[in-house]
Design a protein with these regions (language model features):
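N-terminal signal-anchor transmembrane alpha-helix
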Residues: 1-40, 50
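Cytosolic juxtamembrane N-terminal segments of multi-pass membrane proteins
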Residues: 1-13, 66-79
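Select subsegments of transmembrane alpha-helices in polytopic membrane proteins
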Residues: 11-22, 82-96
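Alpha-helical transmembrane segments and their membrane-interface junctions
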Residues: 26-33, 37, 90-122
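Hydrophobic alpha-helical membrane-embedded segments
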Residues: 29-62, 127
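Alpha-helical membrane-embedded segments
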Residues: 49-50, 112-136
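Membrane-water interface of transmembrane alpha-helices
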Residues: 51-71, 134-138
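Cytosolic juxtamembrane regulatory segments of multi-pass membrane proteins
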Residues: 77-89, 143-172
Length: 172
């Protein structure tokens, strides 16, 4: 079995990355001539529409139904490292949107401002999910895990279980 993905590790660190990329591209659109008002409206529209679509989606509601039915798993089950999990959380959505926004920035800065808003919206939705996840886990004293993939099995284990090998102790 592949190492499990700790969904807390998957959802929290990507938030500032997405928000940061969104604002960097917004700045790029501004630098390439999109007016302050126009870029703000396009950015806000992209963020709002993405957040609205994701926060009201059926898939989101079904995730929490699946989470309640997650399979208990042993605390010793291997969990992917922070670095691998963060890298995996950027693929494909963040990387694809970053590439599309960079291409748009070169050819249509106004479109880049809209896409930058979508990137920021991804960060906002990620933050909402991360907060919901933390509250859900805390209420149940568990950690929610999955295997990589689109529609994956969800697992729970008691909070405080070892997630990866401890670093070697330093000699004093």
């Amino acid at each position: 079995m592949a190492p499990l993905v700790d969904l807390r590790r998957f959802s929290l660190p990507i938030v500032p990355i997405r928000l940061g990329l969104g604002f960097v591209f917004l700045g790029g659109a501004r630098a390439l001539g999109v007016t302050a008002g126009g870029s703000a409206r396009l950015f806000g529209l992209g963020a709002f529409l993405f957040a609205l679509a994701m926060l009201t989606s059926r898939r989101r509601r079904l995730f929490w139904v699946r989470a309640r039915e997650a399979t208990p798993i042993d605390a010793a089950a291997p969990v992917a490292t922070w670095a691998w999990t963060i890298a995996r959380s950027t693929f494909p959505s963040t990387l694809a949107m970053t590439a599309l926004t960079a291409i748009a920035l070169a050819s249509n800065p106004a479109l880049a401002a809209l896409l930058a808003g979508i990137l920021a919206g991804m960060g906002i939705v990620g933050l909402v999910f991360a907060v919901e996840l933390l509250l859900w886990e805390r209420a149940r004293a568990v950690r929610l895990l999955s295997v990589p993939g689109v529609k994956t099995e969800l697992y729970v284990r008691e909070a405080g279980g070892t997630t990866e090998a401890a670093p070697p102790a330093h000699a004093s």
